[in-house]
Amino acid sequence: MDSAFHFYYEENLMRLRQAGAELVFFSPLSDSRLTDVDGLYFGGGYPEVFAPTLSKNKSLLNYIRDLSYKNIPIYAECGGLMYLSKGIKLVEGEFFPMLGLISATSIMEKKLKALGYVEVTTKKETIFGEVGLRFRGHQFRYSDLELDESNPIELVYKS
């Protein structure tokens, strides 16, 4: 956890521990490598505020990309999803490259884009379980995810 990614649900961390995971915390702002890990979890936060620093940490960006090519599970929520995208475009128009693991660009807006509770149902089997699982969550964001139409993303849930 660090200043860029610090919104984590305690229940999620507890469930990971109950499943046998040893949680290792790190900072995408300052760490250049990770210890041996079997998966990555990026919580919410304010990556847009720290976009220049996150974008400059090339050694960690490359290291995480290499891990993704080895097909380790990577889970991200909100700001973490922005970090997985091609990059973050700030309100002022400045663009900062990120991991590029998702064919989309995170675009910051001046006005609130979403606030409230959501419920989704899985359409495919995922690391969380079988088809038809229902999840509840909430949204609070000033960003949109602009999908790259030339490389579409298959969503594994429906709202």
Language-model regions, residue ranges each:
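G-domain G4 guanine-recognition motif of GTPases
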Residues: M1-A4, R141-Y142
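Phosphate-binding active sites in nucleotide-utilizing proteins
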Residues: F5-N57, L61-L67
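A short secondary-structure junction signal
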Residues: Y9-E11, G87, G132, N151
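Generic secondary-structure signature for well-ordered alpha-helical cores
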Residues: Q18-E22, Y69, A104-I107, L145
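Structural beta-strand/beta-sheet cores of well-ordered domains, especially the beta-sheet scaffolds
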Residues: A19-A21, D38, K70, P97, ...
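Structured core elements
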Residues: V24-F25, Y41, A76, Y83, ...
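Cysteine-nucleophile active-site neighborhood
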Residues: P47-T126
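Amide-donor transfer/coupling interface in amidating biosynthetic enzymes
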Residues: M108-S159
